[in-house]
Design a protein with these regions (language model features):
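Conserved ATP-binding N-box helix of the HATPase_c
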Residues: 41-66
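Conserved beta-strand-loop-beta-strand hairpin that lines the nucleotide-binding pocket
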Residues: 1-13, 57-94
Length: 94
């Protein structure tokens, strides 16, 4: 949930070491966060697939991957860091 300042009240961070395969963890973590905030997964479209694909790509390059999940009043945002890159993927909440 967002405060009036637009800053997320809560952030969840998932750290995935390069030495282990990513598996479904990024997608499952997002699904859990959506459930906690009572957000219908269909409201954020293909966000879960995009997060999963990018995390796997970064991990397969031999990099640790850090995934930050944030829920705002108007969007769900995910930031991925790894492989020397930082990517932000978001979807509006309907």
């Amino acid at each position: 949930m967002a405060t009036d300042s637009g800053v997320a009240d809560e952030a969840v961070t998932l750290r995935l070491p390069a030495s282990l395969p990513v598996g479904d963890l990024p997608r499952v973590a997002l699904a859990s966060l959506l459930r906690i905030h009572r957000i219908d997964p269909t409201d954020v479209g293909d966000l879960a697939v995009s997060v999963q694909d990018m995390a796997v790509e970064m991990n397969e390059s031999g990099s640790d991957v850090v995934v930050d999940y944030r829920v705002y009043g108007s969007e769900v945002a995910v930031e991925l860091r790894g492989d020397g890159r930082t990517l932000r993927i978001s979807a509006p909440r309907s």
